[in-house]
């Protein structure tokens, strides 16, 4: 069975992290690396408690920044396959089997899951349906879809670019050029909180604007400065 290393970057995620960790499949094929970016809440306490009770889990520290944290987690891991999860994203119980099956074709270098939100809201269903359709047609994945990749491919690509935004989009574009990728129909469950905080419509417009500006050449650092201003 393929060894899968799960890498979870954290920053002030005390409320969401516990549920994510509790729902990780209890499988010996999993190695769990929690990478904290200097949280100021109780995230590290939640992570430490989990690692104490889970032999194949450990926590490391890294400079704040999702791309940096994921890269450090990958360096610290040993698995032949890397699965990157957001701290508020839960995988299906049979995720290891699903990923291993997807990678039986040697031409496949990685992929992602479909996403659904932890809400009964109609907005949640509409947004997740569009996200999954867009990703399936474009081949571009976002971090909340549970991106997985063969280790040797990840290393050949140099990991995630050290940028403050769009690291998942940038990585997906490069991953597509490295080989075949799969868009799994099985779903991960992720939090709808980001959409609720500012309202679905406002968040949709913000995300579309950021993506458009990125595609036309605005740098992630410029986008990050603008994003902090308009939030």
Name the predicted role of every residue range.
Residues 15-19, 41-50:
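Acidic helix N-cap motif at the loop->helix transition within catalytic regions
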Residues 30-33, 44-76:
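Conserved donor nucleotide-binding strand/loop of the catalytic core
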Residues 82:
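Short aromatic/hydrophobic "clamp" motif used to bind/position activated sugar donors
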Residues 1, 173-231:
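Hydrophobic helical membrane-anchoring modules
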Residues 12-26:
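Short, well-formed alpha-helical segments that are part of the catalytic scaffolds
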Residues 94-122:
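Conserved donor NDP-sugar-binding/catalytic core segment of glycosyltransferases
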Residues 36-45, 89:
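A conserved acidic beta->alpha catalytic loop
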Residues 3-5, 31, 170:
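Cell-envelope/extracellular polymer assembly enzymes that use nucleotide-activated donors
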């Amino acid at each position: 069975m393929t060894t899968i290393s799960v890498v979870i970057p954290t920053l002030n995620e005390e409320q969401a992290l516990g549920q994510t960790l509790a729902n990780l499949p209890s499988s010996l094929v999993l190695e769990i690396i929690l990478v904290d970016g200097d949280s100021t809440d109780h995230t590290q306490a939640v992570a430490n408690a989990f690692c104490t009770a889970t032999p194949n889990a450990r926590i490391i520290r890294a400079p704040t920044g999702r791309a940096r944290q994921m890269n450090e987690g990958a360096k610290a891991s040993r698995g032949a396959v890397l699965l990157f999860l957001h701290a508020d994203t839960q995988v299906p119980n049979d995720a290891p089997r699903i990923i291993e099956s997807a990678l039986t074709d040697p031409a496949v270098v990685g992929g992602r899951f479909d996403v659904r939100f932890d809400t009964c809201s109609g907005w949640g269903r509409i947004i997740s349906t569009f996200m999954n359709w867009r990703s399936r047609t474009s081949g571009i994945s976002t971090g909340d879809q549970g991106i997985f990749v063969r280790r040797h491919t990840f290393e050949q690509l140099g990991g995630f670019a050290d940028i403050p935004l769009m690291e998942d989009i940038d990585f997906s574009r490069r991953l597509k050029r490295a080989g075949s990728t799969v868009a799994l129909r099985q779903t991960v469950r992720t939090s709808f909180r980001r959409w609720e905080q500012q309202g679905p419509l406002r968040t949709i417009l913000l995300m579309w604007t950021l993506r458009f500006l990125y595609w036309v050449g605005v740098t992630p650092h410029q986008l990050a400065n603008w994003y902090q201003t308009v939030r």
